[in-house]
Every structure is written in C-alpha cells, then in structure tokens.
C-alpha cells in the first residue's frame, strides 16, 4: 500500500521506517479526506530543530505549496496530520524530505486515514540517482542574495527554511522529466579527500544507507533498486577542503589533493560503484561548475568521462556558473532552473525521451 523513495531503513528498535536522505519519503493512495501518521523526529540542533517535508497531493508539483514541519520528539512518538480537509474521494499523497541527511530524520511507525488505504500508484518510469553534496541537496537555495537595489550581495543564510532539494538543479531536472529521484550525500561531503577527523567520504561509505552512518550497521542493498541514469556532482568539497586546509587534506591512502588525483577518484568511483553495481550499460552524467568555476572541476569531469570507455554512455556537463559563485555562494533558484533544464535535456538525449 505504500511506495517509498530513496535509501531508507527499518528498525524494530525504533519501531518504524527511517527517512533520512534528501528527497526520501513515501507515497500512498487512499479514499478519504485526511492522512495522518505516527512519527518520531530527530533533529540537528537549534539551527535545524524540525523535520522539513514537501507534501504533494494528487499530482501537485509545487514543493512550497504544502510544507510539513515536524517537531523534534525526544524519542517519543507524535501523531501528525499530513493533509486534511480534502474532498471525499480517492487521493494520492507523496511526502518527501526537503533537507539533507545530516539535518534531520523522520521515523514513521504508522500511516492511516479516515477512509481506507488503496493500492499504491505506479511510480514514474524515469528514476534518477544523484551522488552529490550541498549543491545537489539545495542548501541555501531559497536564501536572499540581492540588496534593495538588486545587487548581488549573498546573505549566506543557510537554515532549514532556505533548504529545498526540489529547487536544486536535481529537483528541477526531475520535475522537468516527471521523474523520481534520490540523493546520496549531504552538505560538505567530498568524493575522496578529507581532513583529519572526518571519517566519511562518498567513496568510502557508498554502501551505507546514508553517508554519515557506518555501513557496517546500516548496509544498503544495491540489488533493491536500479535507476534509469546516474548523475555524479561531487568534487567541490574536495577542492574547497584543500583550499582551506592545504596539505592536511588527504585521501584514505594519505595522498594529497590534486586535480589529477580527483580525476582518478571520479574514474574509480564510476567504475567500482556504478559499473560494478549496475553494469556498464548504465548511463552516467558527470556535472560541475555551479560553484568554484575556476577550480578546474569541469576539466576533471571531462577528462574522467573520456577515460571511462568501458561504459556505453558517460557524458560530462559543465553548468553555467551560479549568480553568487564569484562571492563563494551556493546556487539559488534561478541557477537551478537553468542547470535543471540543461541536465534534463541531456537525460532526454541519453534515454531517447
């Protein structure tokens, strides 16, 4: 009766299914006027005190029309109303997480309605898997970035209220295609390089349900899901960590950051993860350039794509730089719309849509 989206896990100790990653969530079809759930919310502290979800009713696509904000529950279960006051009849409701895996998580124990649950609807035929960081997760995408005269100043206001994965380039791309999508990653995560004290990168923890959970305790089953296409937009934090911390930033083997080393890391990740888990017929798109446009990451991705000759289709997409990129800022909605259109056009070409 329930469709789920994204990497999730069930825990009998927690008494429910945990939704932790950006764009993860559930979808139900029911006959009735309201939908309620029994949940627990774990939050990321005072700056991120709530769970934040977009609710889509009967095919709605506006991720800001219905925002569900759940309160941190301190280990207790709360009964929340997801939607109410609907016209009597059949409805489809999708509840998807706006925020990344290091901010909050929702544990759902029960879903009910004042009518009856029906068989879940068919999922979209196109499904995109994204490996990314804050750019993909839409951190700060809704923040103010212009002064009263229209000059770009960038407020750099990164809170749960200014995050929305559905208005990142990934979300805009999926909306253009009518596709489902999932995200593995979160703000600040790197592909390969890390500073002392940071245990995880995407490369060393991709077999976990979420990038900050140990894969020994939270293993992910790659056989449970097969996307239509895989998008990798990583490397920004590898470069930024190196820029800030210099030679203390190394990979798991102690090698210092270099653009050549990052190229090798991209090639190895695509081969060892996407190729081995899904096969070399899986289309792969490597993205760059919304942030730090002078870092040479577009060249890294282009060079990596050229080396991945085992695959039937690997393309590199360098986006137009974001409007706040020269001030070190994250992409905003206008950037996401342009980049999302660029990527969705590329996916249409790749998949023959």
Describe each PLM feature range.
Residues 118-121, 214-226, 274-278, 349-353:
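Surface-exposed acidic, glycine-flexible loop patches that form ligand/cofactor-binding
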Residues 167, 171, 175, 220, ...:
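Solvent-exposed, polar/charged alpha-helical surfaces in well-ordered, non-transmembrane soluble domains
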